[in-house]
Amino acid sequence: MSWFPSEPHTSLALFDALGVHRDAAVVDVGGGASALVDRLVAHGYVDLTVVDISEVGLDLARDRVGDAAKVEWVVSDVLTWAPDRRYDLWHDRAVFHFLTDPDDRAAYLATLTEVVPTGAVILATFAPDGPDTCSGLPVARYGPDELADLLPDFEVVEARRDVHVTPGGVEQPFTFVAARRVAAT
């Protein structure tokens, strides 16, 4: 699979930049078969939720992580997902850029804002010079300022550029933004 790195170095570095505690409630949106949940479990995170539209992807990750880890696996489209809890950190590497319809983006951002009332977000999308399609689907591309503008209730702590190289050798530039929720005044 080409859509996630074998080692999620940038995401983990941003967890550190945000100072995410090991007992924080973390949701990985679109996590599917990615290795992030494996690394978080190995680093001692104990309150993890992985949401993905693909049950097959979730099963691959579940099989790797095993039953010992306390991970909630949720098969759902993030646009219709109605979580019944709050999270300290929302992580998304590569779902948001597939949302090319303004109404879909608004629904996604409304859910994010609702379920992260005091925490943080790590949002990663294709960079402005990234591909304009992925897996045959159109994508939106963002720079750090554009992502920050979409998150007015959050303050950017760190922004990074990362280049993912697919198994086929194709370079895909990403923009990562780590932002903390601003306290209401």
Residue ranges and their predicted role:
Residues 1-85, 99-185:
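Class I (Rossmann-like) S-adenosyl-L-methionine-dependent methyltransferase catalytic domain
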Residues 94-98:
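Short catalytic micro-motifs in class I SAM-dependent methyltransferases
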